[in-house]
Amino acid sequence: MDYLDLGPYSSASGTVRLPGSKSISNRVLLLAALAEGETTITNLLDSDDTRVMLDALGKLGVKLARDGDTCVVTGTRGAFTAKTADLFLGNAGTAVRPLTAALAVNGGDYRVHGVPRMHERPIGDLVDGLRQIGAQIDYELSEGYPPLRIKPATISVDAPIRVRGDVSSQFLTALLMTLPLVKAKDGQAVVEVDGELISKPYVDITIRLMARFGVTVERDGWQRFVVPAGVRYRSPGRIMVEGDASSASYFLAAGALGGGPLRVEGVGRASIQGDVGFANALMQMGANVTMGDDWIDVRGIGHDRGKLEPIDMDFNLIPDAAMTIAVAALFANGTSTLRNIASWRVKETDRIAAMATELRKVGAIVEEGPDYLVVTPPEKLTPNAAIDTYDDHRMAMCFSLVSLGGVPVRINDPKCVGKTFPDYFDRFAALAKA
C-alpha cells in the first residue's frame, strides 16, 4: 500500500489559493450542459469527481472544450442528445444523484453505476421522488442503491413531490435542478420535504446557482419548494467557481494549530458555501480568525493557554467541515462533542466509525454514537500512528493535521485525495514547518 509520512511539524504559515469547489463545479457543469447557450466556467476543480461528471456529459452528447481550469460548455437546451449510455460515476455523489434525476426525464435508456462504495450509498429516496412523476428506474443489485437502470418514461407533475430530507440533501438538489425540464400543471412543480432537511447550505448553493442560470426557486422555510416547470435554463455567459470551503478547513485549522499567520484565498464572507461556517466553529474554540470577502486569516490561538477550547456543537449544517473539528479536538484542553452528524454514516465511508477508529490510534478516548462523536484528547499524541483513510479524501486530509502536534504520522493511501484535491499534500507541506 502507498503511504506518506508527515512531520513532525511545529508551525504552519503562508498563503494558499484554494482549488474550485467540488459542490459548485459539478452543479455548474450540469446546469451549463442543460442550458441554452454557451457557458465559460473558470476555476473549475480538476479532480476525480469532476472528471467523472465531464466524462458522463461527453457521453451524453454535450460539447465540452477544456483548457486548464477553464471549460466551455455548449448547452443542450434541456435534453441530452444521446439516448443510450453506460455511465461510470466513481464515488461522486454530486454527479450520480443530479444526473440520475436529469436522465430520468430525458427519455432514454441509461445505466448509472460507480465504485463498490457508491453501490452502498443510498439513492432510494431520490428514486421514490422521481417515480412519483412517472420515472422508470430499476435497481440492478440492491433495492435503494446503485447501480440503476433508467428507461424512457412519460413524465407528468400533477401533485406535490415528497422527498425525505434527513439522509442526504443531494436528493432534494437533484429534484430541484431537474424539475424546470419537465412540464407541470399550472407551470410549476412543488417539492415537499419529509423530516428535517440536513445540510441546508448545500441546497442554498443549488438554488443560488439555478438563479444564475435564470430559474428562480421559491421556498417556504426548508420544507416546501416551488420550481418553475417547463422553462429553459439560460447560460449566464461566464461563471467563476469559488474556492472549496470544505478544503479550506484543513488550512484554517493548520493556521490555528501551527500558529500562523496563514491566509486562505478563494472563500470568505461573500462565499455561497455553508462550510465557511467552519471559521466560526474554529473561533469558538479560541482561534484568532479574521475574514474578508474572499479570504480568511488565522493567526494561532487568541489566548495564552496554548490549546484550543473544547467545543459542543450541532454540525448538521456543515457535516464535511465538521470532520476537521474532530481532529482539531485532539488539540483542545477538554472533551469536545460533535452532534447531529448522522449523514457521516453514508458518505465516502462510514465516517463516524472511521474517525473514531483513527482518533484512537493517536491516543484519543472516543465515544461513538449513531449521530454523534465525543472526543477526549490524550495528554500526548501517539507518534508514528498509521492512519487508514478508507478511500475517503477527507479522512486523509484531516489527519495530516496530527503532524502539527510535534509527532510524525503516516497517511495510508494518500492518493485518495484525488477525489477533490489532488495536490493537497504538496500544498500542506509548503506551509508546515519543522
From Swiss-Prot:
Assembly information from the UniProt record: Monomer.
Keyword vocabulary terms for this entry: Amino-acid biosynthesis, Aromatic amino acid biosynthesis, Cytoplasm, Transferase
Main location group: cytoplasm
Among its keywords, does the record have Secreted? no
User: Which CDD domains does this one have?
Assistant: EPSP_synthase
Organism equals: Burkholderia orbicola (strain AU 1054)
Amino acids binding phosphoenolpyruvate: 22, 93, 121, 170, 351, 394, 419
Ligand binding (3-phosphoshikimate): 22-23, 27, 168-170, 199, 320, 347
Which cellular component appears as one GO term in the record? cytoplasm
Q: What is this protein called?
A: 3-phosphoshikimate 1-carboxyvinyltransferase
- Enzyme Commission designation: 2.5.1.19
Catalytic positions? 320 (proton acceptor)
Catalyses which reaction(s): 3-phosphoshikimate + phosphoenolpyruvate = 5-O-(1-carboxyvinyl)-3-phosphoshikimate + phosphate
